[in-house]
Amino acid sequence: RNAAYGMRARANLVMNNWGEAATDAEAALSGYTFLSKDDVSAPGFNSANSPSWIWAGIYKAADTPANYRNITWGGHLCSFARGYTTSQGLYKRINSLLYNMIPDTDVRKGWWINASLESPLLDHMDWDGVTGSAISSLAIPNVKRAFQPYTNVKFAPYENKCGTDINAGDWCIMRAEEMLLIQAEAMAMGGNLGGGKSLLEN
């Protein structure tokens, strides 16, 4: 039901139905909470058990037979599991100009390593005894190439086990945070700029 409200909120926003978009987004939020700063200060975004995920594709280990494990989203986006990304060094990275525009006070800046191959998110990871920023330069033949500057470290591996060859992990389709943004935008565009601003800031 929440996902249906969320879908309608998206549609109403696109159609400039501001009041309906705000109402539907608020309904979609019912029963869900936002991720905290601590929640997003470690690799994650791989589990439908997240309190902010309203709708997700559930992708379990049984759904990833050995000959298909590299073609999952985890095999392409996660920088901590055995897959195309790590074995070939095809890490998803952010442009340095965009990275430098993110304020140092924004926790999301840690979702990528910096030019010195560091991120506070790495402090939460252990790859066969290699921890913290040392993971960046870790190279294992046919398993992991060293990280490049601005590599993404946002997504955790399956069961948070670095080096796993099970590239399962749930795929988020709708989050509570998106609904808050829709609600705030719809309120502001509908003439209640102060209400939308207050909703975002509080």
What are these regions (language model features)?
Residues 27, 33-191:
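Elongated scaffold/linker segments in the mid-to-C-terminal portions of large proteins
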Residues 202:
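CBM-like carbohydrate-recognition segments
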Residues 2-41, 54:
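Aromatic-residue-lined binding/catalytic grooves and analogous aromatic/hydrophobic interfacial grooves
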Residues 17-23, 190-198:
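Structural helix-adjacent loops and short alpha-helical linkers that scaffold large soluble proteins
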